[in-house]
From Swiss-Prot:
It comes from the Bacteria. GO terms for cellular component: cytoplasm. The keyword NADP does not apply. Keywords: Amino-acid biosynthesis, Cytoplasm, Histidine biosynthesis, Isomerase. The lineage of its organism: Bacteria, Pseudomonadati, Pseudomonadota, Gammaproteobacteria, Alteromonadales. Pathway: Amino-acid biosynthesis; L-histidine biosynthesis; L-histidine from 5-phospho-alpha-D-ribose 1-diphosphate: step 4/9. Belongs to the HisA/HisF family. PANTHER family: 1-(5-PHOSPHORIBOSYL)-5-[(5-PHOSPHORIBOSYLAMINO)METHYLIDENEAMINO] IMIDAZOLE-4-CARBOXAMIDE ISOMERASE. It is found in: Cytoplasm. It catalyses: 1-(5-phospho-beta-D-ribosyl)-5-[(5-phospho-beta-D-ribosylamino)methylideneamino]imidazole-4-carboxamide = 5-[(5-phospho-1-deoxy-D-ribulos-1-ylimino)methylamino]-1-(5-phospho-beta-D-ribosyl)imidazole-4-carboxamide. This is 1-(5-phosphoribosyl)-5-[(5-phosphoribosylamino)methylideneamino] imidazole-4-carboxamide isomerase.
Length: 245
């Protein structure tokens, strides 16, 4: 499944290079028009990252996200520094279909497990952003990739499996924003180890060949941001390559 994505800072569509706010590209685009275009080309899910909220929880772009949800028919998945149950409730209340939880799942695992029990596994996607070390260990990073969480991807999956974990978004940090292609080996490994989880791949997608490679890796979906913004290909072409199921 193709999941087009936009990142937002203070209402503007941006892309960061490897999560670095200092390496930001701003696009002169209306968030709603851009997402509508993706939807009109056939996307049934859209991914929004609130980078302002990720940096400062007091400045979450909830009103903008509510307007985007209201203006779109596609299902919306939202991430970016979600740190409290109140924020989860707020997003679900405005019509967001799935919230993406990253650092908190590492730092406060029991708290996030309780959200799975309250809101159901369909409403939560774990974001597992990994640095792969020399031994091949998949170490999950936290706090906008500024620090290592010390937990492996597998240990977190095992912690959430009893709570019905269904959706997980995995980014190889070294590929993010680079347009160097996805780490398909990573997705092959996790999809074969945990076939019951719907894996979303993210990071490095530059071409339709990359989309096809991720499709063939066993991942269930692919988050595409920068490649669509710089028009390497469009959503319609991507869906032709990997039809939504």
């Amino acid at each position: 499944m193709i999941i087009p994505a936009i990142d937002l800072i203070e209402g503007q569509v941006v892309r960061l290079y490897q999560g670095d706010y200092k390496q930001k590209t701003t696009f002169d685009l209306s968030p709603l028009s851009q997402l509508k275009s993706y939807q009109d080309q056939g996307a049934s899910w859209l991914h929004i990252v609130d980078l302002t909220g990720a940096k400062d929880p007091d400045k979450r772009q909830t009103n903008l996200i509510a307007d985007l949800v209201d203006g779109l028919d596609a299902n919306i998945q939202v991430g970016g520094g979600i740190r409290s149950e109140a924020q989860v409730i707020e997003l679900l209340d405005i019509g967001v279909k799935r919230v993406v939880i990253g650092s908190l799942a590492v730092k406060e695992t029991a708290l996030v497990q309780s959200w799975f029990e309250k809101y159901g596994a369909e409403a939560i996607c774990l974001a597992l952003d990994v640095n792969i070390d020399e031994q091949g260990e998949k170490i999950v990073a936290v706090s906008g990739w500024q620090s290592g969480g010390g937990k492996t991807l597998e240990s977190l999956v095992e912690a959430f499996k009893p709570y019905g974990l269904k959706h997980a978004l995995v980014t190889d940090i070294s590929r993010d924003g680079t347009l160097q292609g996805a780490n398909t080996q990573l997705y092959r490994e996790i999809a074969s180890s945990y076939p019951q989880i719907k894996w979303q791949a993210s990071g490095g997608i530059a071409s339709l060949d990359d989309v096809a490679a991720v499709r063939d890796s066993g991942a269930n979906g692919i988050i595409i941001g920068k490649a669509l913004l710089i028009e390497n290909f469009n959503v319609e072409q991507a869906i032709t390559c990997w039809p939504n199921s």
